[in-house]
Regions:
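Boundary/linker segments flanking structured domains
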Residues: 1-37, 42-120
């Protein structure tokens, strides 16, 4: 994943994350020069507000993020990052799979693919 880590402070969040944009994010901490991922999440409508009100705001030192155009895109990116982290053996704080956006019946494209494989 090629993304710039930013300090997880309200001032930094306000200066680098635009309002009213959906997207996904990863919160983490630094250990020996590496960003250790701790939490994968998303916002379906305002990434800035989600980060500013996050329960881990003062518990994780860094965040990375990416905007998406839609809530569906945010869900799919969050799901991808969550699966990538889990498949790499990372010990995330959020162990429960990302939920689909409110009012939607979207399925995770990564779980759905695996569930669709026929077993012989």
């Amino acid at each position: 994943m090629n993304a710039t880590p930013y300090r997880m402070t309200p001032d930094v969040i306000r200066s680098v994350v635009q309002k009213y944009r959906p997207g996904a994010y990863i919160l983490g901490d630094e250990n020996n020069g590496q960003l250790i991922f701790r939490y994968v999440g998303r916002s379906d409508c305002c990434l800035q507000t989600r980060l500013l009100t996050h329960g881990l705001l003062y518990h994780c030192s860094y965040f990375i993020f990416s905007y998406t155009n839609t809530a569906k895109g945010a869900f799919e990116l969050e799901s991808k990052w969550w699966h990538d982290c889990k498949n790499s053996g990372m010990n995330l704080l959020n162990i429960i799979h990302p939920d689909s956006p409110t009012g939607s019946s979207l399925l995770c494209p990564y779980c759905h693919f695996q569930n669709g494989i026929k077993k012989y």
